[in-house]
Amino acid sequence: MPQNVVLPGPAPWGFRLSGGIDFNQPLVITRITPGSKAAAANLCPGDVILAIDGFGTESMTHADAQDRIKAAGHQLCLKIDRAEARLWSPQVTEDGKAHPFKINLESEPQEFKPIGAAHNRRAQPFVAAANIDDKRQVVSASYNSPIGLYSTSNIQDALHGQLRGLIPSSPQNEPTASVPPESDVYRMLHDNRNEPTQPRQSGSFRVLQELVNDGADDRPAGTRSVRAPVTKVHGGAGGTQKMPFCDKCGSGIVGAVVKARDKYRHPECFVCADCNLNLKQKGYFFVEGELYCETHARARMRPPEGYDTVTLYPKA
C-alpha cells in the first residue's frame, strides 16, 4: 500500500535505485546501506517509488530521478508502494470446492519434566525375570537414588555375572566316557603314557638336523660350506655428462654455455676474432675456423679483383 516517507537532509540518503521509463520498469529501491538515513526511515529493498518531492515518477527516466533526488536539500519526501507480505497456504479441493488449508501456528504447551522426575513414580518391587540363562546372567540393582548403583559390591556382582557368560563352563560338569581298566584300549593308552618320549622338535630343526647328519661323513669335523663372495661389477656412470671446454680459452665451462657448430664457448668468449664484439644476440660467421661478426666476415670473404659477388638461391 502507498505510504509517505520523509528523510532528513542533507545527503547521502543511503539507498540505490533501478529502473525508469527508459528501462520500461518502475523505479525500485534495490539496496539499503546499513545505518543510513534510508535504513532509519524503514525503507526496504523492493519498495516502488511513486513520487519524489511531489513529482510523479511514471514519466521519469533513471537520470531524471537521480537529478530530482540530488536536488533535494534539507529533506527528501518519497511516496513508496510496498507489497503486502502474504502467508502461503496450500489449496485443498474437497467435494469440488477449493478452499485454503487451515494452519494453526500456535505453539503447543509441553509439560515441564525435570531430570529424575520420571524415576520410580510408583513404587514397584524389583523382581528378577524367571528362566534366565545362567551363562548370560548379569546382576544389576536399582534404587530410588542412582548413587548405590556405583558401589563396590554392585560393580563386582555385575562383573562376575558378565564373566560367567563369557567364560565357558568347566569340563568337570560334562560327563566323560569311562573305559574299563581291563580293556585292550586302556592298556594301550596306559603303556604309551608310561613310555619315555623324545622331546618335540620343529619341522625346520628336523630338516637341518638331517642335513647335518648326511654330510657328517663327507666333510671333516668342524668344517662348513661357505660360498665365496661375488663382487658385483658396477658399470660406469653412463648417464653422467662430461664438462664442456671452451673453444677459445680452453677452460671448463660451468653454468651457461654457448654452442655453435659443435663447439662450446663461455658467453663472454663468444666474440668476434677481430673486434671482440659479443655475438650472443647478433649474427655470427665462421671463416677458416674462426668466429667473426658480419662486418669482418664480409671483409675476409671479398672476391678477388675482376670477380663479382652473386647470391645463389636454392632450387625449389
UniProtKB/Swiss-Prot annotation:
Q: Where is the PDZ domain?
A: 1-84
For biological process, the GO terms are: actin cytoskeleton organization; heart development; muscle structure development
Q: Which domain of life is it from?
A: Eukaryota
What are the annotated GO cellular component locations?
A: adherens junction; filamentous actin; stress fiber; Z disc
Places the protein is found: Cytoplasm, Myofibril, Sarcomere, Z line
Q: Which InterPro entries match?
A: PDLI1-4/Zasp-like_mid, PDZ, PDZ-LIM_domain, PDZ_sf, Zasp-like_motif, Znf_LIM
Q: Name one GO molecular function term.
A: muscle alpha-actinin binding
Q: What are the Omega-N-methylarginine sites (modified residues) in this protein?
A: R164
UniProt-listed CDD domains: LIM_ALP (cd09450), PDZ_PDLIM-like (cd06753)
List UniProt keywords, sorted A-Z. Answer: Cytoplasm, LIM domain, Metal-binding, Methylation, Phosphoprotein, Zinc
Which residues are recorded as modified (Phosphoserine)?
S18
Q: Which residues cross the membrane?
A: none
For the LIM zinc-binding domain, which residue ranges apply? 244-303
Share what the entry says about its subunit structure, partners included: Interacts with ACTN2. Forms a heterodimer with PDLIM4 (via LIM domain).
- What biological function has been recorded for the protein in this entry? May play a role in the organization of actin filament arrays within muscle cells.
Put simply, this protein is called PDZ and LIM domain protein 3
